[in-house]
């Protein structure tokens, strides 16, 4: 039943709704404005309206709900994108998709502040209803409009709605604010009804399932959920105009320097979110993947649930789904350093530092776990794995085992034993403890005739497989042994690895020992000795419980602590995994304290010096005041005397893994003060971390070598001639995957893994404090001096020919001492050879610019991509070359294949990204307008998965797919591969060199001034059309994610 009225309010021109109905009686009716017939209709119920509305002609469905301000109503927002207007700020273009996402996030954030924290009322995205009306307006112009409705809640009246809307508008970014209509909460408000359109327009307000899926909002299609006036089906929110519980306004806003520190907490504990924005004392995040919530104790896969709240100097973690509880994450330390923040977490036992390994999950019958200051007797089992900290007696108990089962009174005294080590010096160290073993380096010829042999992995080729397996295979520092097979130092890799695997698979007994035992050893033993059970012998005694570790990420604080101890005449040990840092420290200390004696050992030390000193460290290290060394010294070298006072370690994630760094700390066994002061630094990396991801990435690079390139779309199909490759997964392949996993974990999580492993030994950890003096400026200037001197030494070195260069290379590989001047001459030769620049004089500046990793990488990329007349031809040539190598390597030397850096796929991805942007090749001179490029980016990339490209270039996958974020990602790829970028200038985009790329220009003919890339690519003559396209239809705009707005 319905009644019609010409007017809503009383007047002299005709009957109005107000003439017949009071506010009280209207509460039980549903009032609709009929725009088409210019009438107001009053229905006895909403159901009556829906029944009547269903029978009306489409063109007459122009209905609006009349919302009276004094009635309870849902919170609503009208989002409108005007035609022919830029929705961006210069280089910060945001498409509709991102603007909507921003608005929804701000609504949720303001709701959290206004209702969640004070009243524990939660809002999820599933409680948000999103409708659209996209299409052509009366002028045949494309227009986008959306309604956002919080359909499960209501507020008391329009004034409460106004207050909430105002708070939302206050928090919107400036470039987003204009799209939200602030005038939708008037005392009488007409709000379009679902299924209706404006008179003369075909833009119908409707549910959009695809839109709901994109934004993870409600999938409801219940029409009554879209109505604003709410008689009974919602929860009424507390009034915010009359009484407000403030939990944020009374708090100071987070400052920029504090924000950096707060974000570190999220980096540690919340890896599935990215930073969104700050609101007063709240740090808000956007979800990027599902994660487990420690507050709710369950997985969350939707909503931006994570919020960090700063109260005083405390940082709390909150979840939008549970506002009664929070987690104390730590305190603001006054620094902005991640290391200090994480150490604070360890100190307060807020996180678990022990990383359990698969051995711990073995059944009780297969493990012996205890906590004692010395080792118990080893079990006589086929596969024994021993884990214990250093200096608890692992080697002593091994000697007892050998004496018991292989001594003079044993029936196995003549059985074959092979003791494998990973370093030559370690082998000699072991022989001093096991004098009845033969050291491989002290005998020549056949080693099989010796019953007991200590042998380093690189020399395993001197053994042969026999009909009878060895009785006992000992792998001391087993994790390091596995690492060594991936070192690239093997002269005879294939026979060495083959004999190793034969012994591992067939030995009657295997004993593996390591303080840093990990899952790699378990997986390898399970795969290749799975027919016999593993027995795990673990002494959990924490020998290091009296050691004190002080950590910092501040080089200044670390240096000033070091200087203070040197001034107090303390004797210092300085291990570092950076050769440059080691040289810098040596020079810095020599200048400050010329009277002090420094022992310095690195890969640049002569073979004679390393051999003589490492075999008698007690003598040589007893002569020095300061010991500096790189990973040249790890396991196998031990100084037992109590001479040194403090250890200062400097480590980063650009070199060896965490386990090797921790081994370096134990080369001086007894520190007088038991004090270790460590500076840790590491940039964020994005290497694949699981065996599955690493394998996928590895096989994919080889898979593409067998595919045919589609020239038009730069896509792949399998060649009929070569077919799809079949990969034979050999033992080395599985070991290589395990080793890559460990390396990638260290590169991605270096700092946390380092601190965890130290704390897991029982050592006490603290934050290293001190003043930040001006020392670092002098330190930095010395670094520049060292680098410049290297450039000078290389530039002024003798110019040698290929024969002498080959001799130096062979001597280095054989471990034969090479004169320092010859080393510089060899570096000079390699530089000239790389750029084909022989016969040209070079300067120190030339060395600085052209000997950099990035310049060389860009040069190689440019040469490879410009060999053919087109990029397609160049790609095909590179693909053929690498395919031939791959097929040869798989037939002759698989380890070469896994260690080879295949570049074809990286080129394929880089060129694919470039062409999707609208450019034809790396030398394309054409210019794209802002509109052309932004349209390309949206059409080509909004729904494109960049995971494979991220893996290839070790880049973080973009968290959002708006045009500018995509373009930044593309420019990183082009910069890495070619030294190029898509540059923006005055509304136009074109290809431009990066700083490194400008050093190696593309040319048609060789030039004399500097190295260059002689390109065979044909000139690009075709220009891009600027012809305007016709307006798209409704069907062409069905996917909101594929559309953007740009300047015209």
UniProtKB/Swiss-Prot annotation:
One of its GO terms (biological process) is DNA replication. Keywords: DNA replication, Early protein. GO terms for molecular function: ATP binding; DNA replication origin binding. It holds the Pfam family Herpes_UL52. SUPFAM superfamilies: P-loop containing nucleoside triphosphate hydrolases (SSF52540). Residues 1025-1048 are annotated as: Disordered. Induction: Expressed in the early phase of the viral replicative cycle. Disulfide bonds: none annotated. Transmembrane segments: none annotated. Gene3D superfamilies: P-loop containing nucleotide triphosphate hydrolases (3.40.50.300). InterPro entries: P-loop_NTPase (IPR027417), Replication_origin-bd (IPR003450). Belongs to the asfivirus F1055L family. May be involved in DNA replication. This is Putative helicase/primase complex protein. It comes from African swine fever virus (isolate Pig/Kenya/KEN-50/1950) (ASFV).
